[in-house]
Amino acid sequence: MNPRGKVRIIAGEYRGRRIPVAPKPDLRPTPDRVRETLFNWLGQWLDGLACLDLFAGSGALGFEAASRGAARVVMVESDAAVFESLEKFRSLIGAQAIELVRGDALEYLKRSRERFDVVFLDPPFRQNALPDVFRQLPGAPGTRVYVEAGEPFTPGAPWHELKRARAGQVSYQLFEWRSDDQGGLPGNV
């Protein structure tokens, strides 16, 4: 974690703003270098796109997406103190594109069924939540999913890995739903 308890937004409207990180042992804010790589993979700007930050944590990915022009960013967080920190920062910067949802990530997917252009998945490593998330994640051709985990993850068809890298103890990957595999995973048709 950042020693000062803050992580900075790299580019866009909120560039240079520092997101306060709640003092929670399980929070691992995505480092600047990894976020820079991710947004290079995504094409830097997310103008007009709908994004989901399913395990929001520090909010680094969701706030960065909003800063880079995403039309809508839904950030889901279950921890009350972390959620409160996200709310305060959203109000401070006036990020109208961000919708905060307090609750369980898997329950959100069961209820919402909304499709997003870009999904950020950085669950606590010990939860092993990725298989369940991918089973429930509504996708469509072109949907991109960023995964941050302790080890590389393979979700299977219709998801195709576009990029993969490693930074220290973290593996990060970018997947895309490909239309040549119509039918998809259970619950994603």
Question: Where are the regions that the model predicts?
Answer:
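Class I S-adenosyl-L-methionine-dependent methyltransferase catalytic core
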Residues: 1-189
